[in-house]
């Protein structure tokens, strides 16, 4: 009887892993048609740099703080699947008031302060409802995919990335067309409604996905203050501190790349889309390779490699102003920069998430993910706030505006954080030794065709 039950459980887990791939594709519609275009929408509604910094970063902090509610829900025995599909359903509904704000702005000329405040409120609610899902979903997926985490999520993220890229490209074409006929708001209505449909499908799939039995045990619970006190002695605590500080550094500049392109570089929506598509495209190609590498050599090895690449990206963005008189060269240069960005972020995002699965026990997964996200959210908010205040300074030197200061400060702090924190963190599982000389030797023996073949090879089929 036990054997039959085990076989049924394994079948349901495999089926759930396949549903999760489709759910990820639906999420890509939300991301590519919706979330990626919130900053351009805010600019259309007249928000300044400081407000945009708050718009992008404050919801991240609020969304992570409300994850403490998730822990309470789990403690009360509410199923992880219920938390996930209800949270995503409520998140879906927030697109209607966000669209309504634009309609009020363009049809009734309502005060900009009221519109900006409304956008912050409803976008914050959208992120909060999504944030509540995070710890429950991570714990849930940890039970479904107990082995080869890197390989599975490398493949899943590739599917999400492909959907996101196609969605972004389509959204860019829609916005460019309606801007050309002097109706940009109509374009945003269309892409946000498609984002709504994507998240609605995602929510429905989460409701169908199998959830293994889970009974939270109070002896595994610890407060956030207990967690903070143990950070100096805890390897996981040091890892959380590193990622949170990196998010602080990243969010000094992250909310303003769109502003930099649309204002300083005077890009149209299609040019903006081509540049912003590059990183998720490279992500899609490289995540499976990073997943295989991490499964063999450890997640921390990838974090160290990519963590030292991240400081270069905003510094290279600053140099784009020198190509402003050569638009084609400027586009090619930024595509190169975003290719490097995709290389770094593909590995960093995948392995920082997967490190948690290696470092944390099943019983403590939800609580550790919640605390991890809270630290990240606080870092994001403080970074975005500081970046926004600097970006609105009346600074101009040669071709450099205050946004250039924001980018350079972000680069400097990223470098400092990686240099100081990475040596303090250790790998948490047995992995193969990585020899840089051997890696260089193997790479030198590969032709460009070989490299493309490796990148295009699937990283394993989650159905098997």
Indicate where each model-derived feature is located.
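Juxtamembrane intracellular "pre-TM" segments in multi-pass secondary transporters
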Residues: 2-14, 210-242, 431-464
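Helix-loop boundary and gating motifs at the non-cytosolic
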Residues: 2-65, 70, 74, 81-87, ...
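Hydrophobic core of transmembrane alpha-helices in multi-pass small-molecule transporters
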Residues: 25, 94-95, 101, 109-133, ...
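Cytoplasmic membrane-interface "Motif A"-like loop-to-helix N-cap segments
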Residues: 75-93, 183, 296-310, 398-401
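C-terminal ends and interior cores of transmembrane alpha-helices
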Residues: 88-113, 177, 308-328
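Intracellular juxtamembrane helix-capping segments at the cytosolic ends
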Residues: 130-145, 347-361
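Helix-to-loop junctions at the C-terminal end of transmembrane segments
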Residues: 66-79, 175, 286-299, 391-395
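Transmembrane alpha-helix termini and helix-breaking/packing motifs in multi-pass membrane transporters
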Residues: 39-44, 72-76, 99-109, 164-186, ...
